[in-house]
Amino acid sequence: MKNCSEKLWKPFRDEVVISTKFGISFSEYTNGDIIPDARPEKIRQSVEGSLKRLQTETIDLYFQHRIDPKVEPEVVAEVMGELIKEGKIRHWGVSVAPEDYIRRAHKVTPISAVQDRYSMMARGIEKLFPTLEELGIGFVAYSPLANGLLSGAYEKATNKNFEAVVDYRSRMPQFTPEAMKKNEELMAFLQKTAEEHSATMSQLSLAWMLGKHSWLTAIPSSRKLERIVENAGGAVVKLSAEEIKAIDEALDKLPKSDIFGVKNN
């Protein structure tokens, strides 16, 4: 977005939330592996770079992308507090962090949001929800559609349909022929339930998630405008607590394949 960010944001800067991340680099020697780096000097270097690239005076929500085992949470939280006082960020959060890390960091500078993988096929993070509710921390779900699988758009697709190297879905376990076969019953259930609510599968998946808690949101991604519009419609579909519970009970029983980042069996 270099050289065009100001034109994009300026007319409606007060109407959008700008969120970005810090805390990782990519190895030049091991196929681009993620290297956590949350040293205070690196954090400051990262925030200055983001402010410059985004051409904004402050970042609304600044996430630690991955936990750095070499830097204590209190150290990271202290730097976040300094950046808030300096007006460079408004809020901060952590991504893929254990409960102990969250609690320790939160004591130093309150965390506004935790981000992690969450979908109908990746529900392990639900065990952290009571802690987030206790501390008053919001939750941001990434991959809420299991990298597109729960949209139903790839019902007949397998890894071979995605361009190797360029499209990471070509390497994801949920798109193997065996996985697609295993998920047929789940997909049929979601399709039927979506139709009962005059919704698409994507909208049902997102409505189920958003109906769980008022402090939970999701960040589905898409390269197509029609998909973005469709996903936004998930906020309009309303499910009762009883309906959400019934879906949960069905999900507990239905067979599910592994997905990227999660072992289901």
Regions found by a protein language model. Name each.
Residues M1-T20, N159, K256, N264:
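N-terminal binding-site loop/beta-alpha segment at the start of enzyme catalytic domains
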Residues S5, P40-I43, V47, P73-V76, ...:
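Aromatic/hydrophobic pocket-lining residues that form the small-molecule binding cavity
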Residues E6-V17, L51-Q55, I84, A105-T109:
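Acidic (Asp/Glu)-rich catalytic clusters
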Residues S25-G32, L150, R227:
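A short acidic, helix-capping loop that chelates divalent metal ions and anchors anionic groups
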Residues Y29-R44, H65:
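Active-site mouth loops of central-metabolism enzymes
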Residues A38-R53, P98-R103:
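Short, acidic/polar
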Residues L51-K70:
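Active-site groove signature of glycoside hydrolases
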Residues I67-L254, I259:
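Beta/alpha (TIM)-barrel catalytic core signal, keyed to glycine-rich beta->alpha loops juxtaposed to Asp/Glu
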